[in-house]
């Protein structure tokens, strides 16, 4: 057997071993010309439609109307899907809802409708941001058919200040008095919540950290959120000035055992929001017999690179799948595969 023949036999054997066909290019394909590479692409991923600039809430004042926006990632499938509402972090001073595309796209590819939302920040006081968060959930439930959402399977996800919002959504699930604005005929209750390095107690954000003393200032954002800015005869007040008021604005102040499943994740090296925030919330939820999981990420800081890695993202996707389930088929409905090319 010549070396050339041996090489051909070996190539054919390898092709069979790896499931490939040792065939010549299909020269009869329309568009083929000598030298063209002909490949066959298996379809393993569906398409995701992006709907941006969605106005989910309007805040009217004496001189203007502020519009709060959401961006929706919508898998192009025909069934009823669970949904995730993402609340971005920003230290209570910003809410850039276009962040964390890595996590949002992973969830969308896994079959979730993902809505990333703006919410009001300082100098607007509490409870505005929670009213906005609940308004976003109500909006999605009211428009569930439009986005292919199962309204009974909506979860929330947030990081940092957004984690605080997610925790508040879980802690106040079923509580009355938070819903304002439109779509008041539907519930703002959620079915699951994930918090990344969130805040459960506004009075102890820096617990155990060298920077803890900064939180005694009336100018830190949690103090501005709850007590407001200095103005006129009001000189401002630290977050601990009225502990009852502060706890009414904290997730730990609302637990009653009716919370939905919760996943908490925190970095052990976080120096902005103490890891003790998640520890205390986990312990309190366990004491209430809530379905709660806690993941401490060794060496991770606040919003640094580990949070964007596959093991973290996969853990969240898997957890949401376990708690909310997958897509449910709708009889007689087919997706428009050619829409929005």
Model regions: which residues?
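Catalytic nucleophile-loop/oxyanion-hole region of alpha/beta-hydrolase
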Residues: 95-103, 115-151, 306-312
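Histidine-bearing beta->alpha loop at or near hydrolase active sites
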Residues: 121, 297-304
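Primarily recognizes the serine-hydrolase "nucleophile elbow" in alpha/beta-hydrolase
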Residues: 135-211
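Short beta-strand/loop motif that positions the catalytic acidic residue
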Residues: 258, 264-266, 270
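Short beta-strand element of the alpha/beta-hydrolase
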Residues: 80-90
């Amino acid at each position: 057997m010549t070396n050339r023949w041996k090489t051909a036999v070996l190539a054919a054997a390898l092709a069979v071993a790896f499931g490939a066909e040792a065939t010549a290019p299909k020269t009869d394909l329309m568009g083929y010309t000598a030298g063209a590479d002909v490949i066959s692409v298996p379809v393993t991923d569906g398409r995701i439609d992006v709907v941006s600039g969605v106005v989910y809430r309007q805040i009217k004042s004496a001189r203007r109307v502020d519009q709060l926006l959401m961006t929706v990632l919508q898998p192009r499938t025909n069934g009823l899907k669970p949904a995730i509402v993402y609340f971005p972090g920003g230290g209570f001073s910003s809410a850039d809802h276009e962040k964390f595309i890595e996590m949002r796209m992973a969830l969308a590819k896994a079959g979730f409708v993902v809505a990333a939302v703006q919410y009001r920040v300082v100098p607007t006081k509490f409870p505005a941001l929670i009213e906005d968060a609940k308004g976003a959930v109500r909006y999605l439930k009211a428009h569930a058919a439009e986005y292919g959402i199962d309204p009974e399977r909506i979860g929330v996800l947030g990081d940092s200040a957004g984690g605080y919002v997610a925790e508040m959504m879980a802690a106040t699930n079923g509580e009355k008095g938070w819903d304002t604005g439109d779509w008041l005929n539907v519930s703002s209750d959620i079915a699951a919540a994930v918090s990344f390095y969130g805040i459960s107690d506004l009075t102890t954000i820096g617990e155990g950290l060298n920077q803890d003393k900064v939180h005694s200032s009336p100018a830190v954002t949690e103090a501005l959120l709850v007590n407001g800015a200095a103005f006129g005869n009001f000189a401002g007040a630290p977050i601990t000035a009225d502990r009852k008021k502060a706890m009414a604005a904290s997730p730990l102040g609302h637990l009653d055992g009716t919370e939905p499943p919760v996943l908490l994740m925190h970095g052990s090296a976080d120096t902005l929001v103490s890891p003790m925030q998640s520890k205390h919330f986990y312990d309190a939820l366990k004491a209430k017999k809530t379905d709660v999981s806690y993941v401490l990420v060794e060496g991770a800081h606040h919003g640094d690179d580990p949070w964007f890695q596959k093991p973290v993202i996969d853990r969240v996707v898997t957890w949401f799948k376990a708690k909310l389930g997958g897509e449910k088929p709708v009889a007689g409905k087919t997706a428009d595969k050619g829409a929005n090319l």
